[in-house]
């Protein structure tokens, strides 16, 4: 089980709802992923009119927990306003907080992110901040009151996988009591498994499933990868070595096999 703000879930795979070829494929992919939490853009919901109503009906049919986000916000004020609107629309204090610094890389504005997180937490929000893998930023977010931190593996939609393994490993070691979710940059199920092998509590992805040739099958593949990665972490991975180490014992080896 994984805990998000005192709520427990069995699935460690969070999934986005954008970019799918059709609403039906989105539904089927979310079911195949076994996800219990889905991210939803406030801008999509409010700008869609009747389309937005239909989309919301599809989400309700899935019986999942909705995590609204502030995607596209570039300032603290814009992010805070969007979060408050999302709370009214979706009836939840949960918010995936994004404050973007650069349109090309979609890199978080970490200064604005910490400021916005502090404001929202004081206003009763449960904040899921999208950030870089910087330990200092993560610590500031925790100090502000975040019980969940969501560092990227790589830029959003890049599909590069984990580009700074050591930094993500350090975050896990230094923040043992914080729920950590790798968010963004994952492109293959193996990337998700690697994140879970590092001890991350969950992963969040969207494009890797939505843009796959078969999103439904890919969603199932990610589900299995997350389960495998978590099982491996809990089982205890052996440490990598610089030199070979025989797996077959030499005790009892016939003398004619001995090396002179």
From Swiss-Prot:
Residues binding 1-deoxy-D-xylulose 5-phosphate: 157, 184-185, 206-207
UniProt xrefs under InterPro entries: Aldolase_TIM (IPR013785), Thiazole_synthase_ThiG (IPR033983), ThiG (IPR008867)
Catalytic residue positions: 96
HAMAP family (alphabetical): ThiG (MF_00443)
PANTHER family hit by this protein: THIAZOLE SYNTHASE
Quaternary structure and interacting proteins, as annotated: Homotetramer. Forms heterodimers with either ThiH or ThiS.
Entry protein name: Thiazole synthase
Organism of origin: Nitrobacter winogradskyi (strain ATCC 25391 / DSM 10237 / CIP 104748 / NCIMB 11846 / Nb-255)
């Amino acid at each position: 089980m994984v805990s998000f703000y005192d709520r427990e879930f069995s699935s460690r795979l969070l999934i986005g709802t954008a970019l799918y070829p059709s609403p039906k494929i989105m539904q089927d992919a979310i079911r195949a992923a076994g996800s219990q939490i889905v991210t939803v853009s406030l801008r999509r919901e409010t700008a869609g009119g009747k389309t937005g109503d239909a989309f919301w009906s599809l989400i309700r049919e899935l019986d999942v927990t909705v995590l609204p986000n502030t995607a596209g916000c570039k300032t603290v004020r814009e992010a805070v306003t969007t979060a408050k609107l999302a709370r009214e629309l979706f009836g939840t204090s949960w918010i995936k907080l994004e404050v973007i610094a650069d349109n090309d890389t979609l890199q978080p504005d970490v200064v604005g992110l910490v400021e916005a997180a502090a404001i929202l937490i004081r206003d009763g929000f449960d904040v899921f901040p999208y950030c870089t893998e910087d330990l200092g930023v993560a610590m500031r977010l925790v100090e502000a009151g975040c019980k969940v931190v969501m560092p990227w593996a790589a830029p959003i939609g890049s599909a590069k996988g984990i580009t700074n393994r050591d930094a993500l490993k350090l975050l896990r070691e230094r923040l043992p009591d914080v729920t950590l979710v790798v968010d963004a940059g994952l492109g293959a199920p193996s990337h998700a498994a690697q994140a879970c092998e590092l001890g991350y509590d969950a992963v969040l992805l969207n494009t890797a499933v939505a843009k796959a040739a078969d999103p439904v099958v890919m969603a199932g593949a990610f589900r299995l990868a997350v389960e495998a990665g978590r099982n491996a972490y809990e089982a205890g991975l052996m440490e990598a070595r610089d030199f070979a180490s025989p797996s077959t014992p030499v005790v009892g080896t016939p003398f004619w096999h001995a090396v002179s």
